[in-house]
Amino acid sequence: MTRQRIAIDMDEVLADTLGAVVKAVNERADLNIKMESLNGKKLKHMIPEHEGLVMDILKEPGFFRNLDVMPHAQEVVKQLNEHYDIYIATAAMDVPTSFHDKYEWLLEYFPFLDPQHFVFCGRKNIILADYLIDDNPKQLEIFEGKSIMFTASHNVNEHRFERVSGWRDVKNYFNSIEK
């Protein structure tokens, strides 16, 4: 029997990219942005005068290599990997300098995944999977399988997709559909 496929986004789903960006922006621009203040907003809209700084941070060698893993992501992805084919689909084209760091990060924190299942892409409509777990509504709306929105500060007002709020919710979602 063929196993179903789950494609999982990296930034803001497996990795706490926003937390690292906010920390770096606060330090370099002498700001005091709190994560709670971002609910329903994108960082670039809150501080348009620092959009260049944000892009500089994202382009720095090592930035994506040093991100924190989202709570419970490793254990849940490992469990899902026992029953599903797991693919990591990260929209790396926005920051092409991130490829190597993202690859090394995935090898370190998700060593049980097949590196041949790491997909560095732009638009995720190219991904042939049964499920996509992503925080970006634009990626979810073009995906042809079942779209699952992973809660992030910028998408809290989005209601078009089934939602999971953290990796324990992901585990519960897939446990509820297993036969």
Swiss-Prot record:
<feature type="binding site">
    <location>
        <position position="135"/>
    </location>
    <ligand>
        <name>Mg(2+)</name>
    </ligand>
</feature>
<keyword id="KW-0479">Metal-binding</keyword>
<feature type="active site" description="Nucleophile">
    <location>
        <position position="9"/>
    </location>
</feature>
<dbReference type="GO" id="GO:0009223">
    <property type="term" value="P:pyrimidine deoxyribonucleotide catabolic process"/>
</dbReference>
<feature type="binding site">
    <location>
        <position position="9"/>
    </location>
    <ligand>
        <name>Mg(2+)</name>
    </ligand>
</feature>
<keyword id="KW-0460">Magnesium</keyword>
<feature type="binding site">
    <location>
        <position position="11"/>
    </location>
    <ligand>
        <name>Mg(2+)</name>
    </ligand>
</feature>
<dbReference type="InterPro" id="IPR010708">
    <property type="entry name" value="5'(3')-deoxyribonucleotidase"/>
</dbReference>
<dbReference type="GO" id="GO:0008253">
    <property type="term" value="F:5'-nucleotidase activity"/>
</dbReference>
<comment type="similarity">
    <text>Belongs to the 5'(3')-deoxyribonucleotidase family.</text>
</comment>
<protein>
    <recommendedName>
        <fullName>Putative 5'(3')-deoxyribonucleotidase</fullName>
        <ecNumber>3.1.3.-</ecNumber>
    </recommendedName>
</protein>
<dbReference type="InterPro" id="IPR036412">
    <property type="entry name" value="HAD-like_sf"/>
</dbReference>
<keyword id="KW-0378">Hydrolase</keyword>
<dbReference type="InterPro" id="IPR023214">
    <property type="entry name" value="HAD_sf"/>
</dbReference>
<comment type="function">
    <text>Dephosphorylates the 5' and 2'(3')-phosphates of deoxyribonucleotides.</text>
</comment>
<dbReference type="GO" id="GO:0046872">
    <property type="term" value="F:metal ion binding"/>
</dbReference>
<feature type="active site" description="Proton donor">
    <location>
        <position position="11"/>
    </location>
</feature>
<dbReference type="Pfam" id="PF06941">
    <property type="entry name" value="NT5C"/>
</dbReference>
